[in-house]
């Protein structure tokens, strides 16, 4: 599933084609994805101007001129693709239609935004902009890891006394929003913390030290366009490249990259997810 860096990369890719532009025509090609689309969604989107695109955790919000926001979740395999527009150095022509093209937005200026989702775990909804943060998908979320509200004191307080593994705590969207399996593995490796260690056992210094590492990993991943392991593509259809710099994720059986360490990357399963770690470096 796309995590914060992938969603932020897609948001940035959509912005030139959508922000400030009118939705000339919206087409909805089925009744639902993970959940039913809101009633008359195509009609309600057509003629609306996109005021801005923003991200909350793993969700994109397109604020519209009529006072509503289009809430977008990519799910497992969803892609928001831009065509008919100049993106960077290249013009991206419209691709042939696919049976997995579920929502199409024809934008003022000739760009087309296509929501393609083969597995249909994605979602779209319309919500009043002023009440967007109260939407059931957003209301439970913790602070943004790149925002000012997420600091060492906050994280230390939230981890204190917790008897869940530190990995599970960082994946808890109520504690910090947007982190997923890949980036938590990478953060814990850089921090030298074992994924199975109890969150409440961290010293205050260890807990506070996670914050700059979380930001470091996320910003590096955004700069690389995210991580493409299976379905993820940027808005222009290009792959992300952060997977080429993974230090631990997906490297089971390979030597640890820490200078002077003789360890081998191992894999354990926690709550159905693979956790990659160095048993020598991470304690």
Swiss-Prot record:
Write out the residues that bind DNA: 100, 119, 162
Q: Which cofactor does it need?
A: Zn(2+)
Q: Which InterPro entries match?
A: DNA_glyclase/AP_lyase_DNA-bd, Formamido-pyr_DNA_Glyclase, FPG_cat, MutM-like_N-ter, Ribosomal_uS13-like_H2TH, Znf_DNA_glyclase/AP_lyase
Q: Which Pfam families match?
A: Fapy_DNA_glyco, H2TH
**Per the record's keyword annotation, is Hydrolase included, yes or no?**
yes
Q: What is its EC number?
A: 3.2.2.23, 4.2.99.18
Q: Which PROSITE patterns match?
A: FPG_CAT (PS51068), ZF_FPG_2 (PS51066)
Query: Which terms are listed as keywords in the entry?
Result: DNA damage, DNA repair, DNA-binding, Glycosidase, Hydrolase, Lyase, Metal-binding, Multifunctional enzyme, Zinc, Zinc-finger
Reaction catalysis annotation: Hydrolysis of DNA containing ring-opened 7-methylguanine residues, releasing 2,6-diamino-4-hydroxy-5-(N-methyl)formamidopyrimidine; 2'-deoxyribonucleotide-(2'-deoxyribose 5'-phosphate)-2'-deoxyribonucleotide-DNA = a 3'-end 2'-deoxyribonucleotide-(2,3-dehydro-2,3-deoxyribose 5'-phosphate)-DNA + a 5'-end 5'-phospho-2'-deoxyribonucleoside-DNA + H(+)
Free-text comment on the cofactor: Binds 1 zinc ion per subunit.
A single Gene Ontology biological process assigned to it is: base-excision repair
What the entry lists under HAMAP family is as follows: Fapy_DNA_glycosyl
Q: Which family does it belong to?
A: Belongs to the FPG family.
The entry's protein name is: Formamidopyrimidine-DNA glycosylase
